[in-house]
């Protein structure tokens, strides 16, 4: 289709964020952009339970979560399951490159968030995306899947 929209690889997003206002804003922004937000949670256990019951194309996760476990452990679990995870944080962990497909630095705007998900989608499709300010892509495509 010459001028049509390209088919998205990332449609179903799981949001994991410990700040309620940020979680709400992310959910609204992504739903408005046409993504299916399968769930929004603030801790590791709820995130894993959502992964057990839902098909997820991408996890959008902060590093700091409610409870004892962190986004780092969630990224390890996501990697085992073959689900790409994009960190959204102001302080990415030293080993983020080994765990996630990339990182969008906080604070970010609605536009940056949407552009970041589009860039991840293009990356997963094998394309060289234009990266918005604050986004770094880490993983080769095959490492995310």
Where do the language-model regions lie?
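Non-catalytic signal-transmission and effector/linker regions of two-component phosphorelay proteins
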Residues: 1-12, 109-145
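Conserved phosphotransfer cores of two-component systems
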Residues: 52-54, 77-83
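Conserved phosphotransfer microenvironments
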Residues: 61-79
């Amino acid at each position: 289709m010459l001028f049509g929209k390209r088919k998205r690889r990332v449609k179903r997003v799981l949001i994991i964020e410990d700040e309620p206002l940020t979680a709400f804003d992310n959910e609204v922004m992504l739903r408005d952009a046409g993504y299916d937000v399968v769930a929004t949670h603030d801790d590791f256990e709820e995130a894993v339970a959502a992964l057990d019951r839902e098909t997820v194309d991408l996890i959008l996760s902060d590093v700091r979560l409610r409870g004892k476990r962190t986004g780092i452990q969630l990224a390890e679990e996501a990697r085992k399951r073959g689900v790409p995870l994009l960190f959204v944080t102001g302080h990415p962990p030293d080993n983020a490159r080994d765990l996630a497909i990339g990182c969008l630095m906080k604070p970010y705007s609605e536009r940056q968030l949407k552009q970041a998900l589009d860039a991840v989608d293009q990356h997963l499709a094998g394309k060289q995306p234009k990266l918005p300010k604050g986004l770094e892509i880490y993983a080769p495509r095959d490492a995310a899947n």
